[in-house]
Design a protein with these regions (language model features):
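Extended catalytic core of nucleotide-activated donor transferases of GT-like folds
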Residues: 3-128, 143-148, 451
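Short loop/turn segments at strand-loop or loop-helix junctions that form parts
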Residues: 7-9, 49-60, 162-169, 226-229, ...
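Conserved catalytic-core segment of nucleotide-activated headgroup transferases in glycan assembly
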Residues: 14-18, 130-269, 276
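A structural motif corresponding to the C-terminal end of an alpha-helix
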Residues: 28-29, 76-83, 189-198, 285-286
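Structural motif corresponding to alpha-helix initiation and N-cap regions
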Residues: 37, 71, 95-96, 207-210, ...
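C-terminal amphipathic helix plus adjacent low-complexity
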Residues: 150, 316-454, 458, 468
C-alpha cells in the first residue's frame, strides 16, 4: 500500500487558497492512502509512510518562535520516510532557516513558485542532491470553479467597475514587494478620475476572506494586479524585526521614510517573483483582469487574455476603451477562462500526477483511503466557530492554574469545573461532549499536544472537508 502523509498547518483563519492546497493532496494524489497531520495536532508515531509532504502553511511557521519545537515534533516522522517533499512559498522570507531545514531533513524534492535565483535563497540545498521544481501558488479543480462561480453576477449587472485588495509589503523586501500594491492604487486613482467606480485598498482592515472575497470579486467588472514576490532576501527575518521595531518607535513614519532608515546596501537581491492565484480566482468569477505587462504563462497574451499596463506609468487609451465596452471586456474574460480554467493545464489533478511521477509515488485507480491523525479531537468543535477558542482558553487556564488534573477528575465524575463565569455558557456543550474534551486533556498530558496546541486555533483537514461537503 502506498501511504502518503501530508503535514499541514491549517487554522481557523486560513484563506480558502490554503485550504484548497492542503485538501488537493487527498483529492487528487490517487495513491492508496493519505493521512493528514496538522503540525499542531497529533503526530503519528511508529509509522513508516512511503512519502511525506510538507505544505507551505506548515513551512510558514519558520517565522514563529516555535519553529524549532515544531521541527522536533515532525522530524521522527520525516526521517522514517524515504520520499520527502516540501512546498514552500514566500521563500525570500527566513530562507536561511528553510535552507538549513531542507538540508538537515535530507529533503528529496522542493516545489517552489520561484524559479530563478534559487542559489541565492538556498545555497546549501542547491549544492546538494535536492531536486527543485516549479509549483504555482495555486491551481484549480472542480470544487474551486463550482464553489466560486455561484458568486459571479452577470458582467453588465455588476455594481463596481474596479475592485482589488492587496497587501502593501514593507520596504525591506525591495521594490518588487510593493509593485503590485502601488500599481493597484495608482491605476485606481486614474480610473476614478476617468469616472469609473473603484474600491481598491491596501489597508489590513479592508481585507476580505472566504466567501466575502468572492462575493466582492463577483460583483466587480475589472480587477488590477501583477506578479507578487520580492527583490530582496531576508535570510533570518532580521530585516522584518527591524521594521517592526521602527514602526513601534515611530508609528507615523511613511513607507518611504521607513525604507530610508533601513540599511539595504549589503542585502542579497534577485528576482523572487511568482504568479498570484488571483489570476485563477478572477477568471472563475468572470472578472476582467488588468495586469502589469509581464510573462505569466506561455501563450497568455496581452489584449487577448488580459488588459496590459506598462511599467512606465503611462496608460494606453485602449485600456479605458475596454473598460467602457462590455462586449469587448466579455471577450477577454471568456478567453482568459478558456486559457486558465477550461483545460487540464492548471489543475491540481494534472500537477499532482506530475509530482507523483517525478517523486516516485505510485498511483492507483482505486479509491484513496483518507484519514486524519487528529479527527477525534476536532469532533468536539463541531460547526460552531465559538467552541474551539473557548475550549483552548479553558484548558490553557486550567494548566496555568495547575488544576488540569482536577478538571479531568471532575469531568470523569460527570461534573463541569467552571474556572470563570463565562464558562457557564458552555455547560450544555460540555455535558454532551465530556468524553471528547477528555481526549484533548489526555492528548496534552501524553505529549501528543503541546501548549501551542491550546493557543493557536488549528484545525484538521477533515473538518474543512466536512464543511465543504455540507455546503
Amino acid at each position: 500500500m502506498t501511504h502518503v502523509v501530508v503535514i499541514h498547518g491549517l487554522r481557523t483563519s486560513s484563506r480558502q487558497t490554503n485550504v484548497d492546497n492542503v485538501l488537493s493532496f487527498s483529492r487528487n494524489l490517487r495513491c492508496q492512502k493519505v493521512t493528514n497531520v496538522n503540525v499542531l495536532g497529533r503526530i503519528p508515531r511508529h509509522v513508516s509512510p512511503d512519502a511525506v509532504i510538507l505544505t507551505y502553511d506548515t513551512l510558514a511557521f519558520r517565522t514563529w518562535p516555535i519553529w524549532n519545537q515544531l521541527v522536533n515534533r515532525i522530524m521522527p516522522l520525516i526521517e522514517s520516510t524515504p520520499v520527502r517533499i516540501a512546498f514552500p512559498q514566500d521563500d525570500y522570507t527566513n530562507c536561511q532557516i528553510l535552507d538549513e531545514f531542507f538540508s538537515s531533513a535530507k529533503m528529496k524534492h522542493v516545489y517552489s513558485p520561484i524559479n530563478s535565483d534559487l542559489e541565492v535563497l538556498y545555497p546549501q540545498s542547491t549544492s546538494r542532491s535536492i531536486r527543485f521544481a516549479e509549483a504555482l501558488t495555486g491551481y484549480v479543480d472542480d470544487n474551486f470553479t463550482k464553489r466560486e462561480a455561484k458568486f459571479s453576477r452577470p458582467f453588465a449587472l455588476r455594481k463596481l467597475d474596479l475592485g482589488q485588495r492587496v497587501r502593501l509589503l514593507d520596504p525591506h523586501l525591495g521594490s518588487r514587494a510593493a509593485q503590485k500594491a502601488e500599481i493597484a492604487v495608482q491605476f485606481a486613482a486614474a480610473a476614478k478620475d476617468m469616472g469609473f467606480s473603484c474600491d481598491v485598498s491596501t489597508s489590513p482592515k479592508d481585507v476580505l476572506l472566504g466567501e466575502n472575497w468572492f462575493q466582492f470579486l463577483g460583483n466587480t467588472r475589472f480587477t488590477v494586479g501583477a506578479k507578487g514576490g520580492a527583490s530582496i532576501v531576508d535570510p533570518r527575518g532580521k530585516l522584518a524585526d527591524k521594521v517592526r521595531r521602527l514602526r513601534a518607535r515611530h508609528p507615523h513614519l511613511s513607507r518611504r521614510e521607513l525604507g530610508d532608515r533601513l540599511n539595504l546596501s549589503d542585502v542579497m537581491c534577485g528576482d523572487f517573483s511568482a504568479v498570484s492565484p488571483r489570476l485563477f480566482e478572477a477568471a472563475a468569477m468572470g472578472t476582467c483582469q488588468i495586469l502589469l505587462r509581464d510573462h505569466y504563462f506561455d501563450g497568455f497574451e496581452p489584449w487577448r487574455h488580459y488588459v496590459p499596463l506598462d511599467s512606465g506609468g503611462a496608460i494606453d487609451p485602449r485600456v479605458w476603451k475596454v473598460m467602457r465596452d462590455i462586449d469587448l471586456a466579455g471577450e477577454i474574460v471568456r478567453a482568459s477562462q478558456a486559457f486558465l480554467l477550461e483545460t487540464e493545464r492548471f489543475t491540481y489533478a494534472k500537477f499532482l500526477a506530475q509530482v507523483a511521477l517525478e517523486t516516485g509515488i505510485e498511483q492507483t485507480n482505486e479509491k484513496t483511503i483518507i484519514s486524519d491523525s487528529s479527527a477525534d479531537l476536532d469532533v468536539v468543535v463541531g460547526n460552531s466557530s465559538l467552541i474551539l477558542p473557548w475550549l483552548q482558553s479553558y484548558l490553557s487556564r486550567a494548566i496555568l492554574r495547575g488544576v488540569l488534573k482536577r478538571v479531568e477528575r471532575e469531568l470523569k465524575a460527570g461534573r463541569f469545573m467552571k474556572l470563570n463565569d463565562s464558562d457557564s455558557d458552555y455547560s450544555d456543550h460540555v455535558e454532551t461532549n465530556r468524553d471528547k474534551i477528555l481526549k484533548w486533556i489526555d492528548g496534552f498530558q501524553s505529549g501528543d499536544l503541546i501548549i501551542e496546541s491550546l493557543v493557536v486555533p488549528w484545525r484538521t483537514a477533515s473538518s474543512f472537508m466536512s464543511s465543504l461537503t455540507a455546503r
